[in-house]
Regions:
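Short, solvent-exposed alpha-helical surface patches in non-cytosolic proteins
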Residues: 84, 89-96, 184-190, 206
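C-terminal motif of bacterial Sec signal peptides marking the signal peptidase cleavage site
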Residues: 17-18
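Short, conserved catalytic-motif segment at the N-terminal edge
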Residues: 54, 59-78, 168-171
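Short, structured beta-strand segments at or near domain termini in extracellular proteins/domains
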Residues: 346-361
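Short capping motifs at secondary-structure boundaries
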Residues: 80, 95-104, 195, 359
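Functional-site microenvironments in short loops/helix caps that host divalent-cation chemistry
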Residues: 23-29, 49, 55, 59-60, ...
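Sec-dependent N-terminal signal peptides
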Residues: 6-14
Length: 362
């Protein structure tokens, strides 16, 4: 098999992107805390999202919604704190300096672990391919006839990682306030453990992203003409021509666009954000079938994606600088996608949450 074919196999394994679960500690009951104690002051860089009930999933007027965003279903959530912005390079740098942590993109690829996620008999790629690296976006030189063939705009770059977000010759110098990228699920969990935080559930993420606009397509309403003023996304023909109406070709510094009604920035576009939920194609249908309000849902019990049957995926939310109306339009607040737990790319990052319970028990 040629090296090019190995690369295609490799891309197939890791493209849709993002370990063990957080270790439990002795905890106070969440409901008791939220009912009987004063909510503590928000930690620096976070805001309080009050408890409430909302309808999760695509709204009826959203004509671009995908089937796995439906049907809408009722969810009840306790209040929680959430980061105002995506975790930045400066914040992640502090974590690495204090712990010496190495991200998955900085580690040599473990073929034995990888082949367990591949069809039996898949040959081992050449060692020159199994080197530390990550996925980079590459602009196409001509119109792409098949937008399902993601290998046309992604390439494996040895040496790409959070410190070198656009390849081995790039750096994050002068980009302290940009979102950290090339982060896998495992990397995000490690940061959370250090920071005394956790990843949001998918329901928490959408509730926070919607703010007080429960019945709209976007976090600001239904007017798509507002997109370039509010979101770092791809404008023009994807993946050929980005007109840069929003001012940025790739990631943008956090807080570059107006926040939502909760004061949260970049809940649409810039980078996809990891959540704690397993990605399961049928999960929304299962919740809706209960015909009741689900309290504090923790996601599906197992991953299920028939398009990636060998991959364990977590849900990512919010879309990225690559989302466009001609491709995925994932800056819509109900948009969701599966992300391989053990891979990373230049358009995936994360933000964290905390509860009064977590803060009281630290």
């Amino acid at each position: 098999m040629s090296i090019n074919n190995y690369i295609v196999i490799f891309l197939t394994i890791i493209t849709f992107l993002g370990c063990k679960q957080d270790k439990s500690k002795a905890k106070l009951p969440v409901e008791e805390l939220q009912q009987n104690i004063e909510i503590p002051e928000a930690p620096e860089g976070m805001v309080w999202v009050p408890a409430g009930i909302f309808e999760q999933g695509a709204v009826p007027q959203d004509q671009t919604a995908m089937q796995h965003e439906k049907p809408r279903h009722s969810v009840s959530l306790d209040g929680f704190f959430i980061d105002i912005t995506e975790v930045t390079n400066a914040q992640f740098s502090k974590f690495v300096e204090e712990t010496g942590y190495k991200t998955i993109a900085e580690r040599k690829i473990d073929w034995e672990a990888m082949k367990s996620q591949l069809p039996e008999g898949t040959p081992k790629p050449h060692d020159s391919i199994l080197q530390p690296g990550s996925l980079l976006f590459k602009k196409s030189k001509s119109t792409v006839p098949n937008l399902y063939d993601f290998s046309q705009w992604w390439e494996w770059s040895i040496g790409a990682n959070w410190k070198h977000p656009e390849g081995p010759d790039s750096s994050i110098k002068g980009k302290d306030d940009y979102p950290v990228v090339h982060i896998s699920y495992e990397d995000a969990l490690a940061y959370c453990e250090w920071a005394g935080r956790r990843l949001p559930t998918e329901a928490e993420w959408e509730y926070a992203a919607r703010g007080n606009k429960n019945g709209t397509i976007y976090f600001w309403g239904d007017d798509a003409s507002e997109l370039s003023k509010r979101v770092n996304s791809w404008e023009g023909e994807f993946p050929v021509n980005n007109t840069l109406e929003d001012g940025y070709e790739r990631t943008a510094p956090v807080k570059s666009y107006p926040p939502n009604s909760f004061g949260l920035y970049d809940m649409a576009g810039n980078v996809w954000e990891l959540t704690s939920d397993w990605y399961n194609l049928n999960y929304y249908e299962e919740l809706a079938a209960l015909k009741t309000t689900t309290k504090n849902p923790q996601g599906a019990t197992k991953a299920y994606n028939p398009n990636n049957p060998y991959i364990q995926e977590k849900v990512i939310r919010g879309g990225s600088f690559l989302c466009s109306d001609s491709y995925c339009a994932s800056y819509r607040v109900s948009s969701r996608m599966g992300s391989s737990m053990d891979s990373a790319s230049e358009h995936v990052g994360f933000r964290t949450v905390a509860t009064p319970e977590m803060l009281m028990n630290q």
